[in-house]
């Protein structure tokens, strides 16, 4: 790294030399992330169980360090409030005086048992950005459309006035009306369907089509084009490849192709990094920091690369440098790096510094004491400039506008007022979901499931968002997908095999509601052994319905146990509609969330798609775990 080290003191950014002790390096390797629920090994095949464990506990961890569970979805899938659209001013313009007791009052929400949400799903009836996203080529999209509706380019959103004139889609409209024709620009720049006031996330299928159609860009003489392709491949591979390796390991052709493209992308990034391309050095440092793709973790080298990248003008490296220092416990120095990034209008630095201020972490640091309003201003700046690398500013911005962001200081003590603004929150959720934020995708799935924030109920859009979130490891999304396939809807056929598969995935990840649903599915088919097992798993997490069901089973007259059900014997739609009202549906609001518990060992049952499949050496568990540590997106 001599060439990189020589660049450290050239830039006015003034990134200093820094050396880590071996103890510091070990501390930094444990970068904080959302603590997902533990997963047990109820699948008898240890290889399959370990792959599922790696998928949920590694890949689905938050891509942004320090994004804790406090920033996760504030409520369960059924706990969405029923809002009216609010045309209040923007967040920073709305900071006014108010009484302390009125600030951040919790909305009155109802309990969300799995049975209630199933019933609600079956009874539902469908009735600009100011600037381009940073770090993405600003080429004009070349994709064309076959209808006359005005196009909206992904990455740009209509203003509130434009959105008001949008007619929401009829059921025959298709949500994946994308044109995979290569245009030397990533799918984030392509045209999308314009029957929504914001673009839907680009599907995995189209992203893969774009990678295939443009794989020659890796050899492009245009460094920007080649680097954009390499960056996009790493982002897509980070979320999609672990999913394939975990649940579709028989798809060796696609797995091998993505691994090959990932190797090409890493080679190209390393090549440009050695040529002192600032952006390439950032991604190269990221690989060394995380130990991704079988690259041995080297924190000191990552620091050197980040420093050189920052001194060459790539301000996102300042965010990573600050994160490393903050994780080491050196908060004051970390803040200095975040402040430098803020001065360059870096979205990630604005986001992190805003949360430090709003959470009161800097109350004892000079100028930040009792200046929490500045945190709100920084959060809005972060939302305005968010990109696919760090979209978390948008998600936090949405939660603050809904008064759902936990862990913040009492802003009312400073007479700071933030009115609830559901229209702004919806826009921020949608933008974050488009940029790949899994929790935002989960929330948008609920928006279209229940018709919240002024949106209509559109089952297929709900399923689209939930499916995207499920592929990124959101167990609540797997449960929601299972409900849609259990009941079906306009445009969604009943598919009990898929419903069972998604419910089992969420159950294996420790989701208590999914475990209860699994127990109910087996219970209605007379499989007492399996039903008892899953009710017990849910009951361990305090699930009240599961506890009641266990008591009922114990009081029943013992009868011969029927054969274990198979994937073709799941309960039909009529059975689900006859589910009785349970205690949680009449429980008071604000009931504490049911915690997730690991699954131990289930009685034998026929396998679903998660089965033992021989995989080549380079898709082994070792590669998967290291790959899943990559948090590029």
From Swiss-Prot:
Residues bearing PTM Phosphoserine: 148
Gene3D superfamilies: Tetratricopeptide repeat domain
InterPro entries, alphabetized: Chitin_Synth_Reg, Sel1-like, TPR-like_helical_dom_sf, TPR_rpt
KW 4Fe-4S (keyword) present: no
Start-end of each Sel1-like repeat: 278-314, 315-346, 438-474, 475-511, 512-543
Record's keyword annotation contains Repeat: yes
Main location: cytoplasm
Extent of Polar residues compositional bias: 136-149
Region Disordered, residue ranges: 121-151, 583-613
SUPFAM superfamilies membership: HCP-like
GO biological process terms on file: fungal-type cell wall beta-glucan biosynthetic process; fungal-type cell wall organization; mitotic division septum assembly
GO annotation, cellular component aspect: 1,3-beta-D-glucan synthase complex; cell cortex of cell tip; cell division site; cell tip; cytosol; division septum; nucleus
Compartment(s) of residence: Cytoplasm
Taxonomic superkingdom: Eukaryota
Keywords for this protein: Cell cycle, Cell division, Cytoplasm, Phosphoprotein, Repeat, Septation
Biased composition (Low complexity): 592-613
Function: Involved in septum formation. Required for the proper localization of chs2 at the septum.
Protein name: Chitin synthase regulatory factor 4
Native organism: Schizosaccharomyces pombe (strain 972 / ATCC 24843) (Fission yeast)
UniProt lineage: Eukaryota, Fungi, Dikarya, Ascomycota, Taphrinomycotina
Gene: chr4
